[in-house]
Regions:
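ATP-grasp fold ATP-binding core
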Residues: 9, 36-62, 82-96
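Conserved N-proximal alpha/beta basic substrate-recognition cap immediately N-terminal to
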Residues: 1-39, 57
Length: 195
């Protein structure tokens, strides 16, 4: 439950991306709510949002939302299979880490590397992508929208194929050496595990 996890982290003073919960219209009779659209639109006015299934995993039913139409489509898709939608502010996160803690000790650490292409200053995203797919370097389900395919990234420019860091959405895991982890990260993870 993304919202409950956010509430616990907030209560413990642990920094995180806060996830608010918006119940499906079919659940309003149980929550005594008066609807969510006014609050959702107010949040959208502040900037880009991420809407996701409050109970979901793997990057499924996760949408970056910039407009009211995108918000309505995201909510419609999420509420088809979930009673609750988690909404958070979009953050341009460059690096995401996962650490597994057991009995108070970190047992596994890895970072998630999003799929990307490297520009040569001449080839379009479409051509670079076709070459990477042919070589088995990129999954074919990561094709960007048509407008993006004609872009020509500069030489050496990294072109990300997905804004999500999920392994099920094409990212790969890079195992990290536990003794080499930054102390700030280790401290934060141990505090979070205790929460």
């Amino acid at each position: 439950d993304k919202n409950i996890a956010s509430e616990v982290l907030k209560e413990e003073g642990i920094p995180s991306v806060y996830h608010a919960c918006f119940m499906a219209p079919s659940m309003l009779q149980y929550t005594g709510g008066k609807g969510s659209w006014k609050a959702l639109l107010a949040e959208l006015e502040k900037g880009t949002l991420v809407c996701k299934d409050n109970y979901g995993t793997g990057g499924n039913l996760v949408f970056k939302v910039r407009t009211q139409a995108e918000l309505e489509q995201a909510a419609s898709d999420i509420y088809k299979s979930s009673e609750a939608m988690a909404v958070c502010r979009y953050e341009d996160i460059q690096s995401e880490y996962r650490l597994v803690v057991l009995d108070g000790e970190i047992r596994l650490a890895f970072s998630k590397i999003r799929p990307s292409l490297t520009g040569d200053g001449v080839s379009t995203v479409g051509k670079l992508l076709a070459e990477a797919i042919a070589k088995g370097q990129i999954h074919s389900f990561l094709v960007p929208n048509e407008a993006e395919l004609s872009k020509v990234p500069s030489k050496g420019e990294t072109y990300l194929l997905n804004w999500k860091h999920n392994l099920g959405q094409g990212a790969s895991a890079l195992t990290l050496s536990i003794p080499d982890l930054e102390e700030e990260l280790v401290s934060l993870v141990k505090k979070t595990a205790k929460a």
